[in-house]
Design a protein with these regions (language model features):
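Catalytic and substrate-binding regions of extracellular carbohydrate-active enzymes
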Residues: 1-214
Length: 214
């Protein structure tokens, strides 16, 4: 599934469009937004200039697109374009597609159900924070205790929930040693608040749980 931006010259006055692949088969898509804007054009044919365009942002349900690969699609004029997505209404922190179901508890605990095998994986994801006075080649902890995300309160927020993409953010404010004292080979007694965010997402027809963090 791809998130794409399509610019169509305003002078073409499209009421809508369809998208097909190289074989001429229709490709499913959903419209996220539409706006009239301007685009700088630099071309040996059209010369540099500014064009008024209708800009469409959409989810394209493209399958079989490999990493670092290119795949072409054709846009054709149509009588109408599908309606825009409705605003987010679902607030329950559960994500589900045909392959997996992901549940996030109020405490930030993450459980994943594999629908194919009917196996439930419980508490699958956490943040580990530890001391490290090694170098670029090795990690060295010196036996000091770890700090775990589960030991700190979690704020859970549903970011997106629709037929194409679902996303949940887990935020924790972890209180950890402010720095490492290399002269004493131990962590400082002074504490600092470290805000950690995990963003979980799934996509239509995809058996993977995508994880981002800051």
């Amino acid at each position: 599934m791809l998130k794409q931006v399509v610019d169509i010259p305003a002078s073409d006055d499209f009421a809508g469009f369809t998208i097909t692949d190289a074989a001429g088969s229709p490709v499913e898509y959903a419209l996220l937004s539409k706006e009239r804007t301007q685009r700088d054009v630099f071309s040996p044919v059209n010369l540099p200039g500014v064009l008024d365009v209708d800009r469409y942002t959409l989810y394209l349900y493209a399958q079989g697109v490999l990493p670092f690969a290119a795949k072409g699609y054709r846009i054709r004029r149509a009588e109408r374009t599908p309606a825009l997505f409705e605003p987010l209404q679902k607030s329950e922190p559960v994500m589900e597609n045909a392959c997996i179901r992901v549940t996030v508890g109020e405490d930030g605990r993450v459980d994943l159900l594999d629908k194919k095998t009917e196996r439930l994986y419980e508490d699958i994801l956490d943040i580990e924070e530890s001391a490290d006075y090694g170098d670029s080649y090795m990690y060295w902890n010196n036996g000091e205790p770890f700090f775990w995300g589960r030991d700190f309160p979690a704020a859970v927020e549903v970011l997106e929930h629709n037929a194409y993409r679902q996303a949940i953010r887990i935020t924790r404010e972890m209180c950890v040693p402010a720095y490492y004292d290399f002269s004493q080979k131990k962590r400082a007694e002074q504490l600092a608040v470290c805000t950690v965010e995990l963003t979980l997402s799934i996509e239509k027809g995809d058996a993977l749980l995508h994880v981002g963090y800051t």
